[in-house]
Curated annotation (Swiss-Prot):
Positions that bind Mn(2+) 2: D256, D267, E430
Catalyses which reaction(s): Release of any N-terminal amino acid, including proline, that is linked to proline, even from a dipeptide or tripeptide
UniProt-listed Pfam families: AMP_N, Peptidase_M24
Cofactor: binding comment: Binds 2 manganese ions per subunit.
Entry similarity comment: Belongs to the peptidase M24B family.
Name of the protein: Probable Xaa-Pro aminopeptidase VDBG_02538
Length: 460
């Protein structure tokens, strides 16, 4: 049994998370007294239909409860540190169709919660806790039902709780890391299955079907995001969504896909040759991107400035594209002009957790510097944070052509050499890294060495 499987036999550490959030609020609001109040995602019907929308639990709620049930509420008493989960009571009409729901006793056994009551008791419990307390109810704006009353509380604060949870979510505990390892393990199985099938499949949607089937077969019914299965030049589209084009006549597939395990995401990208052998141009670009990733990973550790790691990746991209002749001129001048953004237009990576693009990254999408505008994490990395490292080089005519028309950039690009690379489409390699005090740990076991990929794909 894997170490992460042993950890996951325990309960999701909801009480520890609640106490961390409470301490954070006290640091922002000295002397804070009262309750934390959260609601899970409520059942919602599809438009013009009596069918419910696919359910996705609110991440703020899950962080303090570990509960994936719909229509639940939660209270944490700041004075006593007691947590109470409210679950839906038995609805006889619903039982006819859906069977018996979880009982309070079962919920208390399953979740790391002190008390479990039913949702028809929420207002009575709030009234009890607020009576004569002179305290504050901390909640999240626009996530409180109109039927919920905070009568008796001296104040209601809808400004602090959301940010407090987001800041606490940045640093993961062992259980959260174990969930991410599990998601990575399942996703790796799916990635490898697609690699094995790519030289016999007919189109992208076959590959997507294989990926989803492998995830589902291993218990991961939910994807962290809509996967990208992009063949040929479509790989130059960063978030390609069609996943339906034929594979015939194309060089490579870029697969960006990750399963979710108990609300925690994996986010993995691999690029591999459809024939089982990289073309000369594809291999050249792949080697540059792999170097970008490996050198970026080498410098990771607690306190590293993510902006600097992103810039390092650009410097390596420039060096590689100069060696190929796609770029020409002086490397420092090309970096200063930001011409490399034409080929590497996105950020090096982002925080990972319950959301694929997880909270706490403080990006600046208004940044006037195009090299940093789409960097989803700005600032230093703390130990315990999870980041993706996903450099890429792309040959997207829509992005590159404006650079070719701008003399500021066109003087650095050799169009005759560039023309040899359009069919490569794009290459991206993405792993999930745990930041430690002295370095990092790669949680993604998916193969990525080019010789190993060629052998793996070619042996199918």
């Amino acid at each position: 049994m894997s170490d992460y499987e042993t950890i996951l036999k325990g309960k999701y550490p909801a009480k520890d998370h609640a106490k961390r959030v409470a301490d954070h609020i006290r640091s922002k609001v000295p002397g804070a007294n009262g309750i934390l109040y959260l609601e899970g995602r409520h059942t919602k019907l599809e438009e013009d239909s009596d069918h419910p929308e696919p359910f996705r639990q609110r991440r703020y709620f899950f962080y303090l409860t570990g509960c994936i049930l719909a229509d639940c509420h939660y209270i944490f008493d700041l004075k006593t540190s007691q947590s109470t989960l409210f679950i839906p009571p038995v609805d006889p009409e619903d039982v006819i169709w859906s069977g018996m729901p979880m009982t309070a006793e079962e919920a208390k056994e399953k979740y790391d919660i002190d008390n479990v009551l039913y949702t028809n008791e929420v207002n009575a419990e709030l009234a009890r806790l607020g009576k004569g307390s002179g305290s504050t109810a901390f909640a999240i704006a626009n996530q409180v039902l109109d039927t919920v009353s905070f009568i008796g509380f001296e104040d209601k604060n809808f400004d602090v709780l959301k940010g407090a949870i987001e800041e606490c979510r940045v640093v993961k505990d062992d259980y959260e890391v174990a969930l991410t390892r599990k998601a990575n393990a399942i996703s790796t199985t799916a990635h490898h299955a697609v690699m094995k099938a790519v030289n016999t499949a007919k189109n992208e949607q076959e590959l997507e079907a294989i990926f989803l089937e492998r995830c589902f077969a291993h218990g991961a019914k939910n994807q962290a995001y809509h996967a990208i299965h992009a063949a040929g030049r479509a790989a130059a589209t960063l978030h390609y969504v069609h996943n339906s084009a034929p594979l015939d006549g194309k060089l490579n597939v870029l697969l960006d896909g990750g399963a979710e395990w108990d609300c925690y995401a994996s986010d993995i990208t691999r690029t591999f040759p459809i024939s089982g052998k990289f073309s000369k141009e594809s291999r050249a670009i792949y080697d540059i991107v792999l170097k970008m990733q490996l050198e970026s990973i080498k410098v990771l550790k607690e306190g590293i400035l993510w902006d600097d790691v992103h810039e390092l990746a650009h410097k390596i991209a420039i060096e590689g594209l100069l060696d190929l002749g796609i770029l020409k001129g002086e490397a420092d001048e090309i970096l200063k002009a930001r011409t490399s953004v034409a080929f590497f237009p996105h950020g090096l990576g982002h925080y990972l957790g319950m959301d694929t693009h997880d909270v706490g990254g403080t990006p600046n999408y208004a940044d006037s510097d195009p090299m940093f505008r789409y960097l989803r994490k700005r600032g230093t990395l703390p130990a315990g944070s999870l980041v993706t490292v996903e450099p890429g080089i792309y040959f997207c005519s829509f992005i590159i052509e404006p650079y070719l028309k701008d003399p500021t950039h066109s003087k650095y690009i050799d169009t005759d050499v560039l023309d040899k690379y359009w069919d490569v489409g794009g290459v991206r390699i993405e792993d999930n890294l745990l930041i430690t005090k002295t370095g990092s740990e790669n949680l993604t076991p998916t193969i990525k060495e080019p010789e190993e990929i060629e052998k793996f794909v070619g042996s199918s």
